[in-house]
């Protein structure tokens, strides 16, 4: 692999020198124009359709120069380095008539020329209408990309019943998503875990509101706030390298070509909450001051009362190999999820050579959650006279203060504000961006009140092995009641305050210099970027003891409410019973010293940390056209990472006999490292419809924030360490793909990919671990666990059936399938070195299938999504491995669009028709760890475009 790197490094620097020589040998003077003393000129402009919508991925071609360019995501194009003269320019786009213009360019002048294309032409007797507009734009961008990219437009997202970006992503080949409360939260690309891929907004990496990871919560961003989704499965040197799986780029709405107004209103229903939801959206765009200033503003609001029915288990094995339930929980969740999102795009065209733009997006999600949890926890036989069937029964309610609606409030926010410029100085193009981004999670007044009953003899019913059920041997199920018949006592009364923040400052500059024109044209691109990150996690945790516990318990038991819900989806026999009212928990005046004694819980605060990270990068990229059909790109990226972390050492005092808790700052620990990352991409345009690609790239994934914190947590017989010496995970990637684009809009594609992944990270656990002379029962720490090979195959097909018979043009199919195989090598995990293990986060199979009917404004679509199970967390042995189970999602949606001046769409959708639970299992599929059900959901509404 190092030999390959050295070869590619040489190519990166030799190609810019060698290719001009090759071009001189292959071409005569008619095929290219040399750079000379003449002041160079340029042609710039924008490609739009007859409705004013921009057309990304259009091919703009000058025949006399054998030179073409591709319009960018916002429809803009530029020909630089032109000699003065007259040129015939043609514009080509799938499903549109070719547009042509003859443009005369004076010396040293930039000519602005926009093109408007007319749609609806006949292609092989198949009429391409406006119904396929979004799909057409996406495929045009994908078709002309140098690397392997999947592009999804907002119009396409609107064809599916997806309310957030995570749900939209699961429709793309090679992407699997993990869920939270029935909504897609984290995306996994090409068989890699979520922390091995990046999520960007307009090319900027999005900070994470999560405390421990770099993962971005995709359910924060409503789908209707995004113009285009780009999934770059092959990253080029001008992109951030932290994208082993790929880079998911969310392009927000750009300023329009002409006035644009849309409004959306909708509602829906969820059976768990038995309440209606609300969805609102509005977008306004226009141009002002003789089209110098462009503006696009959007707002989205969603209020979704929902919930879930959940059972969870944890298993242990005794010395004789018998499996028993160590913990058993029945949970009832009620969640109200509110999203607010605002975006603004501005651009100012100073003149034909200079433009400034601003893009900003702000997303806020409030989760008000009440959880009612009944737990049976296995008791140590030594504590109950040697009995092996005794459990502690705990009724716990989660709530918040009155200002948080007596529910646990989790407020997560992400924002990104970017100011940039594009400038043309002769033949040199220069662009820059300065941005500020922030993500935060705020949890105030998170309260828990729990009552317990010890030494309850329990039986386990294993008749349905996937749904074990525990019941008291006495036959009488202990419940909470006002008279405290069973003798429950206070177990927990706590309150937590959490504040997590990550702030990013970024600046980047890019230069692009065309060197030669003609069939062997080439250009050099280079640039630099600085990213400065600050992240901190601050938790304050307090435990309260009532001064008169008997009076408090009597008062508590006078405020009970039955939380059993008819039709509990995990099974009718799972019942949570009576719990303390959320209003009572929220109304407690815990700061009243005459009623409660407060104790700060240092063990809960031991994971607090401060982190600072600076990534300074630079790159060089050389693009060489090899005639009309071949294109080559060679490049190199250098990234210098400097990290500085500080945490805490916590000791509960048990092991040293002091019985005194301590929490001691670690001080800052710093580390720096440099990654040299070559890339080589090759594209063969066999013809206008068939595209072949091959690439070699080198990418990385930085460790999770919490893993690098140099903390030590000693809690009774257990000890946990952070690991500031963790290495970044590196990957060497080889990709091959073939795509054939149908003229009637659609494609069939196949791809192979291979990743050699070094130093992937897992949480390591060990028994009887000695630290500073003391032996601890269990130790845990993150480690670089070894290497892995990941191989995959992707196939995709999307097309209407008009090729069978014109009458079937209104019926079509969208489908894709991805197979991945991974194997861990040199597993650095004591006791598991010889285990045959897959890479964590790597499902073997993912698939999508969608059948649609579209005609005369009516759209009906059936969609299916599948992903196989995968290992999610590595345990100390295979018995403790945690797996994310396979999923099957089925949705149906319909819409009807009518009107011209006021284009109106009425829509309705039904999602999760199979009532797919979020399910984890321990070791084997029959050993359920969690089964959380959300039920079928309904939505309907109307959208109007002016």
Residue ranges and their predicted role:
Residues 111-115, 165-168, 185-188, 200, ...:
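N-terminal periplasmic accessory domains that precede
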Residues 166-205:
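Extracytoplasmic beta-strand/coil segments of soluble accessory domains associated
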Residues 606, 610, 721-727, 747-812, ...:
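Outer membrane beta-barrel strand-and-loop segments of large Gram-negative receptors
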Residues 754-756, 774-870:
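Gram-negative outer-membrane beta-barrel transporters
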Residues 80, 205-233:
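Short acidic/polar hinge/loop motifs at secondary-structure boundaries
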Residues 274-380, 402, 412-419, 426, ...:
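Transmembrane beta-barrel wall of Gram-negative outer-membrane proteins
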Residues 24-40, 48-53, 58-63, 92-96, ...:
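Short, acidic, small-residue-rich periplasmic hinge/interaction motif at the N-terminus
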Residues 7, 492-500, 508-514, 521-524, ...:
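Conserved C-terminal beta-signal and adjacent last beta-strands/turns
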